[in-house]
């Protein structure tokens, strides 16, 4: 209720990312709000959370993916039009994957077909993986690397997307892709003492020795999904 009262943008749609309202809009907070709505719906199915989720999915369809190729943009003008320059051309494979998982979760919660956009985002993001199945940070809308470095969280979102595609289609190719993402995480990012290497450069050099707490969320949820889908 507080989010609706204080942060809802009744003119342009969506919600303010922060208060006071910034001069740019972002899909990322809305993505996490959708995830929260879906989680709330599981424990409070009569609480109206799925209606808010539907509004966010509609925003995804009409605004977030309105740019070339139907890909997920990151930052927008206050009215949700796409800015010029860098923000018009750069997309993040990790977030394409994350929305694939969310769209499958939304379809399951509403007993509706998965939106075709999920396949669009998935196919594009998979095409940007390197030969060993690693996801990089940023690419152009043509799929060319822009920031070829690699973060832990992007690999976890690739794993979740592969698992959601496997669950919805039964295609064993997605199981193989999930195994590849799991191997990347275990062999390169997660350390034996329970930590992780959060950021590699494009050439495999370690860029950061810090372990952001936010990454824990991505790792835990990815492994929870792995256990649920693969019965591992």
Predicted regions span which residues?
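Glycan-recognition and catalytic cores of secretory/periplasmic carbohydrate-active enzymes
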Residues: 1-232
